[in-house]
């Protein structure tokens, strides 16, 4: 059954870790999205792999069963922010890339919203506790932000940066 103290790992590394093309692609993504190590990239790839596997299993089902089970998957991915509309098809699910998953990370969204000057600065703000989602402090840069939570990302109320953004504090 497994040891209850130790959680199952959420990632699977590449089957061929020393291929030049894979290494170059991974390093480019790690740099572009400010990831700390390749494990964070592999976690995103594993999530995408699971989603695509579910979509492929649905495609193998008969039409009436597929239609019934397709809607919950598509709506869940829409709420996660991975799909552009709730009317998306399984082909849209299968066309998702690892970049789509990495764009939903809190670190990336903080940078894209302009709360941080660089992607690495966004990571530092999050780990130091300056960023809140729904007025709740989140210290994990890898937190996947849902479509509903995206509008509620701001500086944490107790953070000196929040006071600076409001114009309250002069010397911080």
Swiss-Prot record:
It comes from Thermofilum pendens (strain DSM 2475 / Hrk 5). It holds the Pfam family Ribosomal_S4. NCBIfam families: PRK04051.1, uS4_arch. Belongs to the universal ribosomal protein uS4 family. PANTHER family: 30S 40S RIBOSOMAL PROTEIN, 40S RIBOSOMAL PROTEIN S9. Gene3D superfamilies: RNA-binding S4 domain. One of the primary rRNA binding proteins, it binds directly to 16S rRNA where it nucleates assembly of the body of the 30S subunit. With S5 and S12 plays an important role in translational accuracy. This is Small ribosomal subunit protein uS4. HAMAP family: Ribosomal_uS4_A. GO terms for biological process: ribosomal small subunit biogenesis; translation. GO terms for cellular component: small ribosomal subunit.
């Amino acid at each position: 059954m497994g040891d209850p103290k130790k959680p199952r790992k959420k990632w699977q590394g590449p089957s061929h870790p020393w291929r030049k093309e894979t290494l170059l692609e991974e390093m480019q993504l790690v740099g572009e999205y400010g990831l700390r190590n390749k494990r964070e990239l592999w976690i995103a790839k594993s999530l995408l792999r699971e989603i695509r596997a579910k979509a492929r299993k649905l495609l193998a089902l008969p039409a009436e069963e597929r239609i019934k089970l397709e809607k919950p998957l598509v709506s869940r991915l829409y709420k996660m922010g991975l799909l552009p509309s709730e009317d998306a098809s399984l082909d849209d699910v299968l066309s998702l890339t690892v970049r789509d998953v990495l764009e939903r990370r809190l670190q990336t969204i903080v940078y894209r919203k302009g709360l941080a000057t660089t992607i690495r600065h966004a990571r530092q703000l999050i780990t130091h506790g300056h960023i809140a989602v729904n007025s709740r402090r989140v210290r994990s840069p890898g937190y996947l932000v849902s479509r509903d939570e995206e509008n509620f990302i701001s500086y944490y109320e107790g953070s000196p940066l929040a006071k600076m953004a409001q114009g309250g504090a002069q010397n911080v």
